[in-house]
Amino acid sequence: MDIKVYEEQVYRIKLGKNPLTESAFQKLIIKHLVNDDGYQCRKSSSYDPVYAMDVDLLFGFFERTQANQMEHLHALYNGGSRATILAKIRNAIAGRGLIDCIWHGVQFDAGIELSLVYPRPSADFDRKATALFDENVLSVMEEVYHKEGERIDLVIFLNGLAIFTIELKCESSGTGWDYRDAIRQYKFERDCKTPLLMSKVGALAHFAMDLHEVWACAALKGADSKFLPFNKGVREEGASHETRAGNPVVSDGIATSYMWEYVLTKDVVFSLIYDFVYYARDRKTNKKKDEKPIFPRFQQLRAVTRVAEDIMMAPGLTVRSRLSMTVRSP
């Protein structure tokens, strides 16, 4: 769809004159991520369903940030270095989980290690750490086939690693579908055993989103998939100030715009990965095989961020500590 066409649709829906199509909704999100959040927009043909990766983007990151290690690996594995590196990364993710590999990197032969991601530095005056952090690349793809005949609306990548999937619905369009239909698709029409959707191995969270609500799932299990609201909540007027489910009405925009204007920004994505996402073991068995991925609700993300902001403003806090707290609350 032409940019002018979908921008006109967005403008008109704000005026209540006509519905927003799902295609226009997708492109609105992509445009904001690219223009305002520094994302790269990648073609779906760049996606490798075997690895759930944008392989070229991942290897570009390696070559920019770890050229010496890559030179040694190329020499070590001869002509098959790319395939061998990918196989070892895939095996590491299958054994340890994606988030652990993001946190701790992947070991190769001869004691060589590759970092998949560089975390936010603890202080801005650490120039080397800041430069490496700046090399991290967030990207977005639309209409991604994770297997033949099954397509995901949007996939978010970090250095070529798929970290979030999003199914979009527009209840204002002719279908009348909303987030519940997106949840149904995830549960009954998506193969959760593919590398992209498999628990621990694939994306860290899966979002079902329409114009008014967002729901998230950390582990797809077919019909047993548990989606939880990822909404801001609506504070009621009056003395009680109670908060009810859903999102506040946005008179001049879309109620779920906080997803692309806040949640998917670089600072918040890194906060989610390093401060919130983890695997919880079953209290009874305490075994690794029984670990369950945990992803926060939006209120938890917002509450912790606001506490961090309050601490940051506390008298006596060192400059170093202030600089390490960069995520703003919505």
Each model region followed by its residue ranges:
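ATP-dependent helicase/translocase motor core
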Residues: M1-P330
